[in-house]
Design a protein with these regions (language model features):
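Cyclophilin-like peptidyl-prolyl cis-trans isomerases
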Residues: 1-198
Length: 198
């Protein structure tokens, strides 16, 4: 069972510690480059975003399984139904950032069923997957525990997701508020784009 060296979370930033049946995975979250996606992940992890699967205050990811594991590709989790078909009861737009690519092992990215269908499902890569660039929102990367990612098998559990914030910017990141404001901002941008396309 792998444990996390907490020195890695002493650096400024925002981290998610995913505690699994195989050990811990520590991920640095890209909250400045993908605020909506990170706010969604944190809000669900901490039970602060309204969804149709769990009550407010109840951590969304705790007890869910990695329902899809493909060797030499990725592990996928975050489906409340355990079959890849479930979500939180809402969807939000992609948040593709040019600096964030599926550039190697340990990339945290949103699973989706096409553009604008993000919900709660995410995946972590085993290797570089450039064909996913521009199609899936990258929002973090593993800083410790890639061996755990590689050891995860189908139906292994996410026991708990713990969010750790270091530094003023990270500590001021209010996931529930940011999720709402970023979602509104992206909707307005899409409306303007659609209007200009007429």
């Amino acid at each position: 069972m792998a444990t996390i060296n907490t020195n890695n979370t002493n650096n400024e930033g925002m981290y998610a510690k995913i505690k699994t049946t195989k050990g811990d995975i520590l991920i640095q979250l890209e909250y400045e480059k993908t605020p909506l996606t990170v706010a969604n992940f944190i809000g669900l992890a901490e039970g602060k975003i309204k969804n149709n699967k769990k009550a407010i205050g109840e951590p969304y990811y705790n007890g869910l399984k990695f329902h899809r594991v493909i060797a030499d590709f990725m592990i996928q989790g975050g489906c409340p139904d355990g079959n890849g078909m479930g979500g939180p009861g809402y969807q939000f737009p992609d948040e593709i950032h040019p600096d964030l690519k599926h550039s190697g092992p340990g990339i945290l990215s949103m699973a989706n069923a096409g553009p604008g269908t993000n919900g709660s499902q995410f995946f972590i890569t085993h290797k570089e997957t450039p064909w996913l660039d521009g199609k899936h929102t990258v929002f973090g990367s593993v800083v410790e525990g890639q061996d755990v990612v590689n050891a995860i098998a189908q139906d292994d559990l996410i026991n708990e997701v713990i969010i750790e914030k270091n530094g003023e910017k990270a500590n001021n990141f209010d996931a529930a508020k940011i999720f709402t404001s970023e979602l509104e901002k992206l909707k307005k941008e899409a409306e303007i784009k659609a209007e200009n396309a007429k």
